[in-house]
């Protein structure tokens, strides 16, 4: 069958495409470029989509074959397979809003939504089916000047629309030039800096609660959201959804939520038959309960020692002692050891309860002569303690007054066993051997634990009580002195405004003996940055000014030992220079102790505490507050009369 090109007579010119239907970048009479990715042309085959745009050459066939001429039909209107994106359409609408002169200067003719005009001669041919434009904001078409400059580049691949689909970083400036009449948007930045925050939210609890475990467990998505109890919506007549979901890994104490964690019904219905196992579900001392109270498994501990010199008069306030200024928060456990305590031990414990307030209860207390030890704990933690056991050691002859010796208290908190020992060793500058003997007698004679099982019996020794517990704190008046005499020590203390504490510690007898390994084996002491705590004139800040001229020394110390390295982290170690009722200054230490989950098959204290002392301390605290308010009211109501 003869082709359409062959049916054209040689003398007849090829029909021209209608005006206004020339593709962008196509010269009149030029064939369309082949689309990228289309199959190559096969000789002898013709594509119906390609319209004739050049005159046909005469064929070599016989005249009879051309006898029946066929009237040529105009070529089909070329179709632009161009999918305009929403961004491109919006850009076109913005261009149409401009002035007619600007449009004519840019396009030459009125733009047509269905076709694209040629920009000039020599432009590469347009492919039949350009790819669809992306709807991304980064692919808004460029201006005509940028488009025409990219048509001749080889990177465009002969496609003039490739510049249209490219991004332009100068889009805001171009839009401002096109729509020059539109007002400029104001700056988003405030004209002045914002006011200062009235509340400082930086706290130590947020820093510790945000610690990341080694397995990055805090950054993994939890399978079930945490449930936080709304403050009072569990009663009848309340909303149907009393529990709010909180997907945050950090439990924040918000004012609209209660600190009392909800208990799910399925946890109450579940029964655990793994008695004494760490994997038991719903265990009182298990890992789940420990994580609820201590997400980082660290308990805050306060340990203090004070030689009261038998004074009956107590300081008017113990806030500096129990609540030091450098601690932003109160501790979870308070252990106070006293040597040569006051005659009224009950009054001393009442003052401690009054100072700590209703948040703490006396878990246990013990006495050995004038050696006292009191153990206060937060009232919501008493359920996780085992029975408390105590033992005493006398290092002097029985007939004498029990002023020298040791007192030990032990218990298990969750799955970690604690031992606290307070001691008063032999006094005297040159009696180092006697003090070493007091230490040996103490570690051998303290009979602890008795009923509470050892958490790790394979690492215990019958000859040393400190090896039978996970965490051991030993504090008291050890009576180790600074050697060298009063003159040498006074010279170091009076060198300048800042005392050279490391130079003083070079003369310390205790540090010297610990380095030899003759005492406190395996124990450590926090770094000392305070002045010697002994011996002061009562009520003054001067050291002993009597005829004895005793050498200032670090007699009061706090030491610690742990079965597992790194379990005890000292936070602060200091003295209380403001308490001057004794010739000794109180010394305290703040610690962070790692706690492990435990088993429920141990003898539990079951919430036991000194209820009578608790009520007495709260009553006295309230009465003093009332007296303080009355004093303020009387002071405000008083007036000054002036006689004119």
Swiss-Prot record:
InterPro entries xrefs: Endo/exonu/phosph_ase_sf, INPP5E, IPPc
Main EC class the enzyme belongs to: hydrolase
S-farnesyl cysteine lipid sites: 641
Molecular function per GO: inositol-polyphosphate 5-phosphatase activity; phosphatidylinositol-3,4,5-trisphosphate 5-phosphatase activity; phosphatidylinositol-3,5-bisphosphate 5-phosphatase activity; phosphatidylinositol-4,5-bisphosphate 5-phosphatase activity
Highest rank taxon of the organism: Eukaryota
Region (13 X 4 AA repeats of P-X-X-P): 10-242
Gene3D superfamilies in alphabetical order: Endonuclease/exonuclease/phosphatase
Modification type Cysteine methyl ester: residues: 641
Similarity comment text for this entry: Belongs to the inositol polyphosphate 5-phosphatase family.
Function in brief: Phosphatidylinositol (PtdIns) phosphatase that specifically hydrolyzes the 5-phosphate of phosphatidylinositol-3,4,5-trisphosphate (PtdIns(3,4,5)P3), phosphatidylinositol 4,5-bisphosphate(PtdIns(4,5)P2) and phosphatidylinositol 3,5-bisphosphate (PtdIns(3,5)P2). Specific for lipid substrates, inactive towards water soluble inositol phosphates. Plays an essential role in the primary cilium by controlling ciliary growth and phosphoinositide 3-kinase (PI3K) signaling and stability.
Name of the protein described by the UniProt record: Phosphatidylinositol polyphosphate 5-phosphatase type IV
Species name: Pan troglodytes
